[in-house]
Amino acid sequence: MTAPPRPTAPPGAAALTGLAALHAWVDELAALLQPDGIVWCDGSRGQTDRLTKQLVAEGKLIRLNPEWRPNSFLSRTDPSDVARVEDRTFICSLDEADAGPTNNWREPEGMRAELREAFAGSMRGRTLYVVPFSMGPIGGPLSQLGVQLTDSAYVAVSMGIMTRVASAVLDLIAAGQPWVPTVHSVGAPLVDEAGVRQEDVAWPCNPVKYIVQFPETREIWSYGSGYGGNAILAKKCFALRIASVMARDEGWLAEHMLIVKVTSPEGRVFHFAAAFPSSCGKTNLAMLKPSIPGWTVETVCDDIAWLRPGPDGRLRAINPEAGFFGVAPGTGELTNKTAVEALWGNTIFTNVALRDDGDVWWEGLTAEPPAHLIDWEGNDWTPASGRPAAHPNSRFTVSAAQCPVIADEWDVVDGVPIDAILFGGRRATNVPLVAQARDWKHGVFIGATISSEQTAAAEGTVGELRRDPFAMLPFCGYNMADYWAHWLRMGEKLGADAPAIFQVNWFRKGDDGRFLWPGFSENARVIEWIARRVEGSAGAEETAIGRLPLADELDLDGLGLPAEDLAALFDIDTERWLAECALTEQYFARFGPRVPPALTAELASLRDKLRA
């Protein structure tokens, strides 16, 4: 679309607002970035089609066979630009202590000078795309606005899938609504300082990368990468790092969580939010197909949730995104048929393999690979090649509306009421299949101590733990201990209306090293018990680590689970748990006196209960 009309600010205005502020910001950045031209994005199908045709003509997208994947494309990144770069991700708070020990901190003014030098002229020879977007339904009470500047048409198109890009966003900005400014450049100008133009490449990027968040001013600057979360700034950068700071200041929660709508055979509806670190079954739970009759699970969101107390006092949540940016390998007919069905068309695939018939393939999509492929780097591939055909972090970008089990409420403006919150890691030892927290404080302690075992456990010990509190380790925009305190305050505010909190672990292993629980669709049996606990129809046994299902409370009909495996799934080894308490104490020590006293009290209480 053309740029919106420029209102004039009153003479002597101390600060511009509305569209005047937006235009002034775009003008200021354009002077720094020096693009050849500026295009304002409106999210329309016509503009998106023009951009994808342009990307195909430039060799940056490959159009897939429309018979197999209508309106779908494949992109191949530079081999150096395939994932988030956590070591080049910075939280530039005014006070280093506010970033905390889990974030990379840099002094803000020094970083600003560094960024201005990197961004100066970075868009010479390229087009600057202005992308106004809404996180959450446009105009909703839980939604937020942003504007991204980018020199990547691939990013502009991806933003149109992952967020709500529309001219209506500009109407809200014109009316005075605040917005988050985000700036992105691949850092590969096509014209040098002498005016000499060079040829473009299929995936421009720069060896030097910056992904920088300024919490106090709600700004995001990203340089050097065209990949996913580094470049689609609405995702992790805004929806979690900046939004978590906004949530702290404004009394809500921005979380790395899925939300599912669960309906019982009696027709009762529940909404569960769940936080899982990577490789812990998050997407599979978000799109769960229950193995037990009468229960249905529908997707509200698969990755990020924003939660805020509603007018009725209950915690309500929205999906701030409009699309899925999922990991392709391992997504197949057997593991997640729902996700595969969502990818029928209108999808951008990145770094997967190309079949000879013009469709895509990745490891895990089918049991047997095709006889010949073009791999993610553009080379011939056969099953004898001895290397993956798709990159392990290859992705699909698709509208959430295409998910065959998307809940009708996935984009309601005031969100859905949350009945329970689940936390889970990948634990071979100690953590039972499911346990309910005694209360909100105990639940926050569980969330703060989420971990996955990185090494095999020696006999009688716990393996090395990778801590990922609330699954927010790479994404919390401020001091993690302050984040825990914010969760505790939220519990005080919610009071008796607070959701119940549970811990789940699909990955407990037996002494012989095999998984004790079948997982996948059978996880619905655990979800059923959680739902029954929420409605008050299932019993529980009080233990040192939380409330466990009473005998025969879990529906195991037809599962064929040996009694000894069931016992092992809920076994509480006192010595191993005391050893884990020592590891938790060491972990809390990283945060010094900022750890909330309520959490150190929970740790002490856990030790007392184990020794009782």
Swiss-Prot record:
Q: Which SUPFAM superfamilies does the entry link to? A: PEP carboxykinase N-terminal domain (SSF68923), PEP carboxykinase-like (SSF53795)
Q: Which PROSITE patterns match?
A: PEPCK_GTP (PS00505)
**Sorted alphabetically, which keywords does the UniProt record give?**
Cytoplasm, Decarboxylase, Gluconeogenesis, GTP-binding, Lyase, Manganese, Metal-binding, Nucleotide-binding
Q: In which pathway does it act?
A: Carbohydrate biosynthesis; gluconeogenesis
UniProt remark on cofactor binding? Binds 1 Mn(2+) ion per subunit.
Q: Per UniProt, where does Mn(2+) bind?
A: 236, 256, 303
The lineage's top-level taxon is: Bacteria
The active site lies at: 280
Where does it localize? Cytoplasm
Residues bound to substrate are: 84, 227-229, 278, 393-395
What's one Pfam family the UniProt record gives for this protein? PEPCK_GTP
**Which InterPro entries does this one have?**
PEP_carboxykin_GTP_CS, PEP_carboxykinase_C, PEP_carboxykinase_GTP, PEP_carboxykinase_GTP_C, PEP_carboxykinase_GTP_N, PEP_carboxykinase_N
Cofactor(s) it depends on: Mn(2+)
Q: Which reaction does it catalyse?
A: oxaloacetate + GTP = phosphoenolpyruvate + GDP + CO2
Molecular function (GO) terms for this protein are: GTP binding; manganese ion binding; phosphoenolpyruvate carboxykinase (GTP) activity
Please give the Gene3D superfamilies that the UniProt record associates with this protein. Answer: 3.90.228.20, Phosphoenolpyruvate Carboxykinase, domain 1, Phosphoenolpyruvate Carboxykinase, domain 2
Which residues of the sequence carry a binding annotation for GTP? 279-284, 395, 426, 520-523
Look up the record and give one Gene Ontology term from the biological process aspect.
Answer: propionate catabolic process
Do the record's keywords include Metal-binding?
A: yes
Q: Is the keyword Ribosomal protein in the record?
A: no
Function of this protein?
Catalyzes the conversion of oxaloacetate (OAA) to phosphoenolpyruvate (PEP), the rate-limiting step in the metabolic pathway that produces glucose from lactate and other precursors derived from the citric acid cycle.
**Self-association or partners: how does it assemble?**
Monomer.
Q: Tell me which HAMAP family the record gives.
A: PEPCK_GTP
The name under which this protein is listed is Phosphoenolpyruvate carboxykinase [GTP]
Which gene is the coding source of this polypeptide chain? pckG
